[in-house]
Regions:
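Terminal-proximal interaction/regulatory segments of ATP-powered molecular machines
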Residues: 62-66, 70, 74, 302-313, ...
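Conserved P-loop
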Residues: 65-98
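Conserved helicase motor core of SF1/SF2 NTP-dependent helicases
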Residues: 78-82, 96, 100-106, 115, ...
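Conserved motor-coupling elements within RecA-like helicase/translocase cores
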Residues: 84-89, 110-118, 288, 353
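C-terminal accessory regions
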Residues: 200, 296, 307-434
């Protein structure tokens, strides 16, 4: 009875879609009961929805009464922190927010003298963390606390110096668990299987059987690729899959510049999907209009929006010189002078998308991007797509990216210091050594 009072006429549909919502929404129903309902509905034990619910339950139990384990969850970007919250049901914060960044000093309030209050610190998307930020994080870790780093070492390394996650794994100084098994549902996805092929230096399967979620649209010249990309985004994906070309589709580019770069494609996609009308504002090299998809490009803790967050412009008030953006239903207002925090986001770079996921990803590939065509870049782009991935461009460019697995080595001495420490060396690992 409580179920129908909570969900109304949509109770059956909602529970069938996600039975684990029962544990979240209805008092007296826990994970185990919801899990029994899921089993009766035929949800497999290894289904991702069950994994997420189980993880949330496990963390909640660890932090619950009687266990006295304080768990802190963080990620390097706001978008990744939000995904962490959605996956676990616990609060995920950016590393900067966790460490209480001080804009006046450029440092952090949390450190050796004022450490974090946790027994277990979980860092997601750890491949994105550079040596300087990791140093600050470790200095703030209290004595006796455990650190769990979660990340995909095969993705792009951090924008800042070092390759912390790769060096930690390569040192053999700490326990490492590699998740390599592809479960049954995932094995049916061409996105997953082709991502694994790319990561192993093999060309992805480009033939698209019925029901495929991975496509390759060949185009010999960049101009042809740009035209085909616009057609795919504007017409083919909405008609065939019933998806919104603005809200559901994200174009990810290897580079920002060039005819197939993010900036040029943003302007072309804006013209195709949301042509500027009379109500517009031009600032910082962009034209903003109601209905445009935009990206926040800096962490703004006062507005509670973060680097990489996507939103839709809902209103422009010329009298007040203000623009309103909806971020997942939450309205945020910007003065015209603050619009340097926003860029059009129909297209963005793969680097900028790291740590995010999108329903549909479209990736242009051309030999003009030769300087950036690398296996880890392509792998990172492909793994951003949840329901559909479309590559548009030259087969030669795709092959160049797959073959180029020689990521530039970054020298930070972290691996050597860790190896020396694990052998009982007198090498000091800490602020002085760094």
């Amino acid at each position: 009875m409580r179920i129908f009072k909570t969900y109304g006429q949509e109770a059956i549909a909602l529970i069938t879609e996600n039975p684990y919502r029962l544990a979240r929404d209805i008092r007296g129903i826990g994970f185990r009961t919801a899990d029994q309902v899921a089993a009766k509905l035929g949800i497999a034990k290894e289904a991702m929805i069950r994994v997420r619910a189980g993880l949330s339950f496990g963390l909640a139990e660890a932090t619950g009464q009687g266990h006295c384990v304080q768990v802190a969850l963080c990620a390097p970007t706001g978008r990744a922190a939000k995904r962490l919250t959605e996956s676990t049901g616990l609060e995920g914060r950016t590393i900067h927010r966790l460490l209480e960044a001080d804009p006046k000093t450029g440092g952090f309030k949390r450190g050796e003298e004022h450490p974090l209050e946790c027994d277990l610190l979980v860092v997601d998307e750890a491949s994105m963390v550079d040596v300087l930020l990791m140093r600050s994080l470790l200095k703030a870790l209290p004595d006796g606390a455990a650190l769990l780093l979660v990340g995909d070492v095969d993705q792009l390394p951090s924008v800042g110096p070092g390759q912390v996650l790769a060096d930690i794994i390569g040192s053999d100084a700490v326990p490492v668990i590699r998740l390599t098994e592809v479960f049954r549902q995932a094995a049916q996805s061409r996105i997953i299987t082709n991502a694994h092929r790319i990561n192993q230096g093999q060309m992805p399967e480009l033939t698209a059987p019925e029901g495929s979620d991975f496509f390759f649209v060949e185009a010999d010249e960049p101009e042809d690729a740009a035209r085909k990309l616009l057609t795919v985004v504007q017409n083919r994906i909405p008609k065939r899959f019933g998806l919104d070309p603005v809200r559901d589709v994200q174009v990810l580019c290897p580079m920002n510049r060039g005819s197939l770069g993010a900036r040029t494609l943003n302007i072309a996609l804006q013209q195709a999907l949301n042509p500027p009308g009379a109500q517009r504002v031009e600032r910082f090299g962009w034209t903003f209009c109601p209905g445009d998809k935009v990206m926040q490009v800096a962490n703004d803790y006062e507005r509670d929006v973060f680097n990489g967050d996507l939103g839709i412009i809902t209103a422009i008030d010329m009298e007040e010189s203000a623009l309103t953006v909806s971020f997942e239903g939450r309205a945020v207002e910007y003065g015209f002078g603050e619009l340097d925090e926003l860029v059009l986001a129909y297209a963005t770079t793969i680097h900028k998308a790291q740590g995010s996921e999108y329903p549909v990803v479209v990736i242009p590939l051309a030999t003009q991007h030769y300087a950036m065509l690398a296996r880890n870049l392509l792998y990172t782009g492909v793994t951003r797509g949840k329901r559909l991935v479309v590559l548009v461009g030259q087969r030669k460019a795709l092959a160049m990216a797959v073959r180029n697995g020689n990521a530039r080595r970054r020298w930070s001495k972290l691996r050597e210091w860790l190896q020396g420490s694990s052998r009982g060396s007198s090498t000091r690992i800490g602020p002085q050594a760094a």
